[in-house]
Structures are given as structure tokens and as C-alpha cells.
């Protein structure tokens, strides 16, 4: 599993904190905005492309408020994404919704909270079962 991460200009500082945190946890991290800072639309599309390259990959996109990146991610066929600003939602969106991308706002989530959000997301596992009906509905929408 690789964690694909990207950020626009507003999210670069928080992205580096999260990237370091993930690397300390021995996760494979792919930064799609390491060499070129792009708009959140292009960054989100780049993250989603890499997430879709492997069923095990997860994605994290950071912009100022998390909303713009979320809107882009939800337009991608087969992608379930969640905008999160707390630890429990990050964990539950993996378990119940099989979200493969989360978006965060650097103006919303402080570094300590962001690390806990990331922990919940990457450690969460999809529960399947009764939740699959909802995931199937989401996947039919795009």
C-alpha cells in the first residue's frame, strides 16, 4: 500500500508534516506535488490517478479548507472521498464508506489533529457487509 499525497500552495506546510509522520510510521509515501505546486484541481486529479493505479493505495489531499479538493475527488468515477477534520470521521469513512481519499484543510486542522486524522484513515479497514450496499450506490453515481 502506498499513501499518495498532494497539496496546493495553501496546504504545502501541513503536507510536509503529514509526509514526515507517515514516513516515521514506515509507510510508502508518494508526493505528487513535491516538485511542482499546482492548483487543488490538478493536485487532486494527480492523487486520484495514483490511488486508482492500485486497489491498496490511499490518497490524502490538502488545500486551505479541504472542500475544493473534496469536490474534485467526488467527480472521479469509482472514487469515494471524504472531507474530514476530526479523527473519528477519518476512521469511520474507511470502515463504513471505503473512502480511498480524504481531503483536509490546512486552515482547519492543526498539525497534531492532522496526524491523528491520518492515523485513523490509514489504520482503518473497510468493514464491507451491510456497508457495501451504500458503496455500490456511490459507485453507480459517476
UniProtKB/Swiss-Prot annotation:
Descriptive protein name: Galactose-6-phosphate isomerase subunit LacA 2
Major enzyme class: isomerase
Summary of subunit composition and partner proteins: Heteromultimeric protein consisting of LacA and LacB.
Alphabetical list of NCBIfam families matching this protein: lacA, PRK08621.1, rpiB_lacA_lacB
Keyword Isomerase attached: yes
BP-aspect Gene Ontology terms: D-allose catabolic process; galactose catabolic process; lactose catabolic process via tagatose-6-phosphate; pentose-phosphate shunt, non-oxidative branch
Similarity comment: Belongs to the LacAB/RpiB family.
HAMAP family noted in UniProt: LacA (MF_01555)
Pfam families: LacAB_rpiB
Keywords noted in UniProt: Isomerase, Lactose metabolism
Pathway(s) this gene product operates in, as recorded in its UniProt entry: Carbohydrate metabolism; D-galactose 6-phosphate degradation; D-tagatose 6-phosphate from D-galactose 6-phosphate: step 1/1
GO molecular function annotation: galactose-6-phosphate isomerase activity; ribose-5-phosphate isomerase activity
Catalytic activity: aldehydo-D-galactose 6-phosphate = keto-D-tagatose 6-phosphate
InterPro entries assigned to the protein according to its UniProt record, in alphabetical order: LacA, RpiB_LacA_LacB, RpiB_LacA_LacB_sf
Highest taxon, organism lineage: Bacteria
Record bears the keyword Metal-binding: no
Lineage: Bacteria, Bacillati, Bacillota, Bacilli, Lactobacillales
EC numbers for this chain: 5.3.1.26
